[in-house]
Swiss-Prot record:
Protein name in UniProt: Histidine--tRNA ligase
Family: Belongs to the class-II aminoacyl-tRNA synthetase family.
Classification via PANTHER family: HISTIDINE--TRNA LIGASE, MITOCHONDRIAL-RELATED (PTHR43707:SF1), HISTIDYL-TRNA SYNTHETASE (PTHR43707)
Gene Ontology BP, a term: L-histidine biosynthetic process
Matches recorded under HAMAP family: His_tRNA_synth (MF_00127), HisZ (MF_00125)
Length: 411
C-alpha cells in the first residue's frame, strides 16, 4: 500500500530545512534583542477557544475532532487566541507589559494554492498590558525590523479602526461589524447597499466613503476634517511621530479594517512583491481580546508573519560550513572513530558506517561535496599525524590533529 503525505502539507529536504531554520534564527535574534520572550502553546486546544473568538462559522476551516473523553478539540488555526488563553490561565501576575513571541505551525482546512497550505508556520509577537502609543509604535517598528533583517522590502500600510468607528458610534454593534467586514473586503457596492438599508444619513455615508478611500503619508489633516481632532486621532498621530523616530517607512490607508471584530485601534498590513495574489506577509494591530476568555479589560498589540510566504521571497541562505569525512581501513577504523569524535567538537564530521573500502569512502566524500577528507592510515598513525586532503584543489598534507583543527577552524 502506498501512503502519501496529506494534501496541503509539505516535506522539507535537508537543504530546505537548514534554510528555514537559519531564517527562523535570524528572526528569533531580532525579537530577543527587542526584549521579547518566546512561549509555546499546545498544538491542539478546546474548540470553544476559537469559536468564542471567531464565531461558529470558523468550524468549516478547522481540523476539529472529538477526543476519547468526548471533548470537542481542534488543531490550532492561529496563535493569538492560544496566547490570550495562556495569559488568562497563567500569565496575569507577570509584570506589564508582557512582551511575548512564538513560532509554531497552524492548521486550516482550506483549498491549497500558491502561498497557502493546510499546515503553515506563523511567527508572531504579542505585547500585552499596554494601550499606549509607544507600545503600538514598538510593535510596528519590530515588524519592520524583522522583515528588514530577512531581506524583504515590504509596503507597510497603517490604518485606525477607532477613527472609523467614531463615525459609526450611533449604529448597532452587529451593523458596525458588517460595515467593517465590507470595508475590509473593499466591497463598496455592498457597503452602500447596507447603509441604504439601515437608513444611514447622507452625511455619514459621505464621510465614511471619503475616510476609507484616504491613502498616503500626509493625509491626517484631511482625516481631521472628517472626524475632527478626536482623542483616537491624537493618539494615532503620536504613534506616527514615534514611527518616524524609529525610521519606519509607511503610508496611511484608512480602508484597512483587518476583518476581525476584536481589533480596536491601530491596524497595519505589510505587502511584498513576488507572491502573486497572496502578497500580504504581515498583519496586526491593537486589540481587546483577553476579556473574552475570562480575563480583565487588558489592551494588547500584536502581529503575525506568514513564515511560508516569507520563505518564498527571502534571499537569505545559511552560511557555508566546512564539512569533513574521516576515511580509514579496517585496521585503523577504531582510531578513525576517535579522530572523528574529537573533531566533532569543532565542526561537522562524518565517518564510514557502511564498511566501504577505502576507495568507496573517498568516492562517497566526493559525492556529498565534502570540503576535506582526513585519512587515518597505518603510516599516518606511526608518524603521529593524519593526512588532510582538500577535495577542491586535490592538495594534501600531513598534519597533527591539533594542526588540522587550527587550520580548518581558522577558515
Amino acid at each position: 500500500m502506498s501512503v502519501n503525505r496529506p494534501r496541503g502539507t509539505r516535506d522539507f529536504l535537508p537543504a530546505d530545512t537548514a534554510r528555514r531554520r537559519y531564517v527562523e534564527s535570524v528572526m528569533r535574534n531580532v525579537v530577543l534583542n527587542w526584549g521579547y520572550s518566546e512561549i509555546i502553546t499546545p498544538t491542539f486546544e478546546h474548540l470553544d477557544l476559537f469559536t468564542l473568538k471567531s464565531g461558529e462559522g470558523i468550524i468549516g476551516e478547522l481540523y476539529n475532532f472529538t477526543d476519547k473523553g468526548g471533548r470537542e478539540m481542534t488543531l490550532r488555526p492561529e496563535l493569538t487566541a492560544p496566547v490570550m488563553r495562556f495569559y488568562v490561565n497563567e500569565l496575569q501576575p507577570f509584570p506589564k507589559p508582557l512582551k511575548l513571541f512564538y513560532f509554531e505551525n497552524c492548521f486550516r482546512y482550506e483549498r491549497p494554492q500558491k502561498g497557502r497550505f493546510r499546515e503553515f508556520w506563523q511567527f508572531g509577537v504579542e505585547l500585552i498590558g499596554s494601550g499606549k502609543s509607544d507600545s503600538d509604535a514598538e510593535v510596528i517598528a519590530l515588524a519592520s525590523a524583522l522583515l528588514k533583517a530577512v531581506g524583504i522590502k515590504g509596503d507597510m500600510k497603517l490604518g485606525n479602526l477607532a477613527v472609523i468607528r467614531t463615525l459609526l458610534k450611533g449604529l448597532e454593534p452587529e451593523i458596525v461589524s458588517n460595515v467593517m467586514r465590507l470595508v475590509d473586503k473593499k466591497e463598496y457596492a455592498g457597503l452602500e447597499a447596507l447603509l441604504d438599508e439601515i437608513g444611514a444619513e447622507e452625511q455619514l455615508k459621505s464621510d465614511l466613503f471619503r475616510l476609507i478611500h484616504l491613502q498616503g503619508r500626509y493625509i491626517l489633516p484631511e482625516v481631521k476634517g472628517i472626524v475632527g481632532n478626536i482623542p483616537e486621532l491624537v493618539s494615532f498621530e503620536k504613534t506616527l511621530k514615534l514611527l518616524d523616530a524609529y525610521g519606519v517607512d509607511y503610508s496611511l490607508d484608512f480602508g484597512i479594517a483587518r476583518g476581525l471584530d476584536y481589533y480596536t485601534g491601530m491596524v497595519f498590513e505589510v505587502y511584498a512583491e513576488g507572491l502573486g495574489a497572496q502578497k500580504q506577509v504581515c498583519g496586526g494591530g491593537s486589540y481587546q481580546l483577553i476579556q473574552l476568555f475570562g480575563g480583565g479589560d487588558v489592551p494588547s498589540t500584536g502581529f503575525g508573519i506568514g513564515f511560508d510566504r516569507i520563505m518564498e521571497i527571502c534571499p537569505l541562505v545559511p552560511p557555508a560550513q566546512k564539512s569533513l569525512v574521516v576515511v580509514s581501513k579496517p585496521d585503523t577504523h577504531l582510531e578513525a572513530v576517535k579522530v572523528a569524535t574529537e573533531l566533532r567538537n569543532y565542526l561537522p564530521v562524518q565517518i564510514d558506517l557502511m564498511e566501504r573500502n577505502f576507495k568507496a569512502q573517498l568516492s562517497y566524500a566526493n559525492t556529498i561535496n565534502a570540503d576535506y577528507v582526513i585519512i587515518v592510515g597505518e603510516k599516518e598513525l606511526e608518524a603521529g599525524k593524519l593526512t588532510l586532503r582538500d577535495m577542491v584543489s586535490g592538495e594534501q598534507e600531513l598534519l597533527t590533529l591539533e594542526e588540522i583543527i587550527e587550520k580548518i577552524s581558522g577558515q
